[in-house]
Amino acid sequence: MKWPVRVKISVGLARGLAWLHHHNKRFRVFHHNISSKCILLDRNFEPKISNFGDAMFMNLMNGELLELGFDKKDVYSFGVVLIELVTGKETINASANSDRTPFSLRDAVDKSLIGLGFDGEIFEFLSIACKCVQSLPEQRPTMLQVYQTMRATGKKHGIVDDH
C-alpha cells in the first residue's frame, strides 16, 4: 500500500476517534477495542470504525469520568494501528518499544516506503505512534491532539486535504 493511502487511513481513523471522544462535551464514546481488524475501508480507502461491542457510551455531566482514562485506551490502540500502517506488520507489544522512541522502530518501517519522498512524514507519524503507546496513560496525547498533529503533518507534505 502506498504511503498517501496509509496517511488517508490513519488520519481518517484519528478524525473518527477524535470525533467520538470530543465532539460533544456532554456525551462521549470510547471504543475500547480499536485494532486493524475493526477498521473497514470503502472503495476510496476512507476508514470506517466498526465493532462497537465493547464501546462505552458516557454522559459526562462533569469531567470526573475522563479522569479514569477511558479515552487513553483508545489512544494506545490507535498508536498500535498507526505502527502497523507504518511498518506493514501486525504489532504485538508496542509499549515495549515506545520508550525507545523511533530508533528501535525505524528499522521496522516498511522498506517499500523509504526513499520515495515521504521519509520525513513517515518518521513524524512513527513519533506520534510512539507517543500514543506510552506505558503511562497520562503521558499519552488526546485523540484530538493526535488528529490535529497528523492533519498538520499531512497538509505540510501535501497529502491531507480538508474535510
Question: Model-found features: residue ranges?
Answer:
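A broadly tuned "polar low-complexity/structure-edge" signature
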Residues: 18, 25, 87-90
